[in-house]
Structure formats: structure tokens, C-alpha cells
């Protein structure tokens, strides 16, 4: 009998898990970049101030750290209550936006590009609030149907 992963791992688990895995991978790369920047700019832990380039990298790492605590559960809840494929699309949009922004911070390709910064801000916020709003709607609908409020 062939191994059927779809019956074991449904889409509402697999899709947000993929987003979470990639997001945590991005976060790990940023942590590595931050460690390298600490060595390069001679900023000893736990200090987070020093060279402006170091502060840029530390700032992006901090932004990602703060966002992961919200984006991962929102992606899972949206996938469960609304749509796994839409959670993949919205979570993927957030990830691509974050990767582009991270590249501009960490790789010095676009130091002060306001257009790229604005696109990142719009995409990341729209995708996050869509995930959060959809999750709240799904939970509300579930409660309404359960208790006929």
C-alpha cells in the first residue's frame, strides 16, 4: 500500500507549516547575519547600539522576531477556519515581502530605497491583517454556529 501523506497531513496543517518553516529559516539566517555583524562592527552582546550598519541589521532582526509571534499563529488559524490555500498565499506574501526587506537591510543592495520600504510595509501589513481578520471571522462564525448567538 503506497504512503498517502494527504490523509495523514491535511492541507490546513501542511501549508501553514511550510510558511512557518521558511519564516523560522529566514529568522535563523538573520540571527546569523546579526552575529556576523557583531564581529564585523565589534559590538559585544548584549549591546545593540554601535555602528549604524550594525543597528540596521539588528533592527531588521528585531522586527522579524516580533512579527513571528503573530504571523505563525495567524497563518495556522486562517488555514484552519478559512482556507489553507489562501493562508499559503497570504503567508507567502508576507514572507516574500520580509525577504525583500531583509535583503535591503542585510545585503546592502538598496540602502535607503523608500519605494521598496513602502511596498514591504504595505504587503506585510495587508497580508498580516488579512490573516488576522480572517482568523477572527472564522472563530466568530464558528462560535456563532455553535451557540447560535
Swiss-Prot record:
Its EC number is 2.5.1.18. The chain crosses the membrane at residues 7-27, 123-143. GO terms for biological process: leukotriene metabolic process. It is an enzyme of class 2 (transferase). SUPFAM superfamilies: MAPEG domain-like. Pfam families: MAPEG. It is found in: Membrane. InterPro entries: MAPEG, MAPEG-like_dom_sf, Membr-assoc_MAPEG. GO terms for molecular function: glutathione peroxidase activity; glutathione transferase activity. It catalyses: RX + glutathione = an S-substituted glutathione + a halide anion + H(+). The keyword Disulfide bond does not apply. The keyword Signal does not apply. GO terms for cellular component: endoplasmic reticulum; membrane; nuclear envelope. Belongs to the MAPEG family. May perform the conjugation of reduced glutathione to electrophiles. This is Probable microsomal glutathione S-transferase.
